[in-house]
């Protein structure tokens, strides 16, 4: 209860699908006993019904950013039952790194797979996953076998960004330039669970 969870997901793709449903069940059971149980949710953008709808339906989200398209969550926001920060998507990661948004307790990130040397094969979206994995105290990974193995190699994860005043231009000058890694990095000491799923994306 009260934790801030950074979840993967961007335009209905690559969001976690198992853990949010299980969390919603726990929250509903706690509320039935009269216990207060809500979480703060950060994402890359919109997600899917297994995340926003499931948690909003049981009044499980205390605070949400930066974007929402779920009708159940929208009703909670507009009625004042859920706090919401409608911010530009590009501002989320820098503000998280600068500490403006507070502590990130848990990262819950869907991946396509994990390499033998511990690198993460990104799923069908990346969003703020790099930031969540770096900033969170604990990490839960959802490995989704529904996602195509062909996703390995199409991403370009850039690890050269810095905060002002040390920030420099991203060295991307041509449409076919690659400046980063095919994989997301993770500290294995922070990984507390790996959950398997085969559920499809909303989009």
Predicted regions and their residues:
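Conserved alpha/beta enzyme-core scaffold
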Residues: 1-203
């Amino acid at each position: 209860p009260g934790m801030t969870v950074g979840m993967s997901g961007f335009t209905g793709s690559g969001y976690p699908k198992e853990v949010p449903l299980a969390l919603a069940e726990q929250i509903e059971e706690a509320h039935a006993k009269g216990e207060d149980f809500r979480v703060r949710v950060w994402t890359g953008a919109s997600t899917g019904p297994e995340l926003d709808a499931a948690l909003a339906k049981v009044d499980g989200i205390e605070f949400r950013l930066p974007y929402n398209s779920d009708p159940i969550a929208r009703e909670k926001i507009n009625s004042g039952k859920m706090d919401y920060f409608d911010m530009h998507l590009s501002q989320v990661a820098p503000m998280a790194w600068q500490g403006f948004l507070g502590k990130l307790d848990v990262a819950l990130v869907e991946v396509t797979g994990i390499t033998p040397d511990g690198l993460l094969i990104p799923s069908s979206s990346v969003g703020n996953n790099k930031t969540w994995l770096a900033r969170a105290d604990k990490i839960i990974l959802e490995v989704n076998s529904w996602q195509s193995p062909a996703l390995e190699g199409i991403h370009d994860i850039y690890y050269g960004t810095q905060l002002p005043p040390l920030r420099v231009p991203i060295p991307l000058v041509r449409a076919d330039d690659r400046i980063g890694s095919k994989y997301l990095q993770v500290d294995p000491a922070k990984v507390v669970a790996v959950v398997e799923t085969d559920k499809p994306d909303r989009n």
